[in-house]
A protein has these predicted regions:
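Bacterial Sec-dependent N-terminal signal peptides
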Residues: 1-20
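Structured catalytic-domain cores with a bias toward divalent-metal coordination
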Residues: 16-365
Length: 365
């Protein structure tokens, strides 16, 4: 019918009107030897907000160097119109004050799963903020049924974890016109004004403004049910380390928190395997656990938030996956080993998008 054609065209126009990363930054996210600054990212976020009814750009505070600290809320247009309602439901469920089991079940039915996805906390781990930009763009513009279902049933909090660090590291890397000399090494100063890499040790005391900004969203404003904290790098001979984490787990947590984390890990590793993306290691295949409890992800466990950490390889300067003989034999910690090979930034971006989609697909069900 004519109406169907008009609706289809309008959907296509909406997708086309959201600027692609390449149209804004001048290169595709994941291109070799290319990083983007926070200044350019901030301008991109504003363009996306102006062109899409699936987003709400929120300034959650200022950074220590005085930049705006952003969170992009992404969901269906219908949900975006009712964010306060869904935030209130998430708060009530998290605090559980005066709720009967029946009340809680009704709220869970009425609400939407709230999922936090961040990027860039450790600014030299440059996959983080770049996968964040590309995932956001794809979630907003893709028209497949999975994406539509995710937007309908979840509210995604895309949180920039370190604007100051992105500006410093990207400018430092891109300063050389000779691409072969580009490197994030030997930064002239800390990539968080006062504590640098230890910005992920600040979430139990919140001395830094960025930690306060993010913790306010985590524990007062939104209380996400799932929190995905992106890091680098993966163990040698693999691509990415993620949940389930190694034993022993922190036994003060609810068993349901641990099994939910393990289920999330199963969804993530299975998706990569189904997409023929080998190299996901878990359990005893990495050193990561649930025991360090002052970080962005691990502090969340004390609030019964399913906190996910992945550590992935990758750099805009192409690299090699080395030969590690003990990593070539499949086992429960590495069911699908990866052979030694050349590795590109785009590979890591693609893996990260798959992992984000696995988490969001799980949350939407």
């Amino acid at each position: 019918s004519l109406l169907s054609i008009v609706l289809l065209l309008s959907v296509q126009l909406i997708a086309q009107s959201v600027p692609s990363p390449k149209s804004h930054f001048g290169f595709n996210i994941g291109d070799n030897y290319k990083l983007t600054t926070f200044t350019a990212t901030e301008a991109y976020l504003k363009k996306v907000e102006a062109s899409s009814n699936k987003v709400k750009l929120v300034t959650i505070g200022k950074t220590e160097e005085g930049r705006n600290h952003y969170m992009m809320v992404v969901s269906s247009p219908e949900n975006i119109k009712q964010l306060q309602k869904y935030k209130s439901i998430s708060q009530k469920l998290a605090r559980a004050e005066g709720l009967s089991d029946e009340d809680a079940k009704q709220l869970a039915d009425d609400g939407k799963a709230v999922v936090w996805i961040d990027g860039g906390l450790h600014a030299t781990e440059v996959v983080g903020i770049h996968q964040w930009i590309e995932t956001m763009y794809q979630i907003i513009t893709r028209q497949d049924e999975e994406t539509k279902n995710i937007l309908k049933n979840t509210i995604i909090l895309f949180v920039h974890a370190n604007p100051d660090g992105q500006e410093l590291v990207s400018n430092w890397y891109m300063r050389n016109t000779d691409t072969l000399k580009r490197s994030t090494a030997a930064l002239p100063r800390l990539y968080q004004k006062y504590i640098g890499h230890d910005n992920n040790r600040d979430f139990f005391m919140m001395n830094m403004s960025e930690s306060k900004n993010m913790s306010r969203q985590q524990y007062i404003e939104w209380m996400p049910q799932i929190l995905y904290n992106h890091h680098q790098t993966g163990p040698a001979g693999t691509v990415v380390a993620g949940p389930p984490y190694r034993d022993p787990f922190n036994y003060v947590y609810s068993p349901l928190l641990i099994t939910s984390l393990d289920a999330m890990g199963a969804a993530m590793s299975s998706r990569l395997n189904a997409e023929q993306k080998p190299g996901y290691t878990m359990k005893g295949g990495s050193v990561y656990s649930t025991w360090w409890n002052g970080g962005l992800r691990t502090t969340a466990y004390y609030h019964n938030i399913v906190g996910i950490l992945t550590e992935i390889i990758g750099s805009p300067t192409p690299m090699n996956i080395p030969l590690v003989p003990q990593r070539l034999i499949p086992n429960s910690g590495l069911p699908f080993p990866i052979a030694p090979q050349k590795w590109y930034f785009k590979n890591s971006i693609d893996y990260s998008i798959s992992l984000n989609y696995a988490v969001l697909n799980y949350a939407a069900r």
